[in-house]
């Protein structure tokens, strides 16, 4: 191309090669920007289930996980949901729901126990709801949960476990007992009942959660994550 007619073609190609990646990153960052105001509970739940579908389909987006994304949230956080999950190393909510930094507020405790855990778990959940205005709490159990399995064995064998483990399984035993007599796999029933017990506890928890549940501004649901398939299935009717 003649210089009098504009920038030579060779220079245009060089400029495109130099600035193309930068433009792509800026466009991607713009697409991944979050609305700082939390969505409602139904939309938050749809987002989580859609992310899990991507995870099981092998089509994860893995959004907002760069150092720049972490720095962008250094001044505040706007999670869509609280996930109360087991501490099991195979359960990683950010991965199985295909979300990025700042999307979910995760509280992890062995057996995803709510009852009897004191101010640490309760205060963490209440903080997310009261201060961060999170509209959804999801209690997430998982297949083959060792804590529930230990509680079931504790009841069946009437044995004693060492240290604080014994106290932990004592908190799960009522849910295991409630699952007795249900049709189907005894361990799976106990795991689902343990999740449901946690959901019921949170729905009644005063003074922060229960009024919001009653007013319809907070939803508490339960689900179970299948370690074999990666799928998350809601635990009965979402309330």
Name these PLM-found stretches.
Residues 87-112:
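Active-site cofactor/substrate anionic-group-binding motifs, chiefly glycine-
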Residues 69-81, 86-91:
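Glycine-rich, flexible N-terminal cofactor/catalytic loop recognition
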Residues 28-30:
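Boundary at the C-terminal end of the N-terminal hydrophobic targeting segment
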């Amino acid at each position: 191309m003649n210089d009098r007619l504009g920038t030579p073609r060779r220079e245009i190609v060089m400029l495109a090669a130099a600035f193309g990646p930068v433009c792509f990153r800026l466009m991607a960052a713009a697409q991944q920007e979050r609305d700082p105001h939390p969505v409602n509970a139904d939309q938050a739940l749809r987002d989580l289930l859609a992310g899990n579908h991507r995870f099981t389909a092998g089509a994860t987006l893995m959004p907002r996980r760069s150092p720049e994304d972490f720095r962008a949230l250094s001044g505040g956080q706007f999670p869509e949901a609280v996930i109360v999950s087991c501490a099991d190393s195979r359960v990683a909510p950010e991965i199985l729901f295909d979300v990025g930094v700042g999307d979910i507020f995760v509280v992890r405790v062995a057996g995803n126990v709510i009852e009897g855990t004191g101010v640490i778990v309760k205060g963490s959940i209440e903080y997310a709801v009261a201060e961060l205005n999170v509209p959804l709490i999801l209690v997430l159990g998982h297949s083959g949960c060792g804590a529930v399995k230990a509680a079931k064995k504790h009841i069946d064998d009437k044995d004693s476990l060492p240290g604080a483990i014994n106290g932990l399984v004592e908190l799960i035993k009522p849910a295991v007992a409630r699952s007795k007599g249900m049709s189907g796999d005894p361990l799976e029933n106990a795991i689902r009942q343990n999740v449901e017990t946690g959901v019921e506890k949170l729905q009644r928890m005063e003074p922060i959660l229960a009024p919001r549940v009653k007013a319809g501004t907070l939803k508490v649901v339960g689900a179970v994550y299948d370690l074999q398939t990666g799928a998350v299935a809601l635990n009965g009717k979402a309330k």
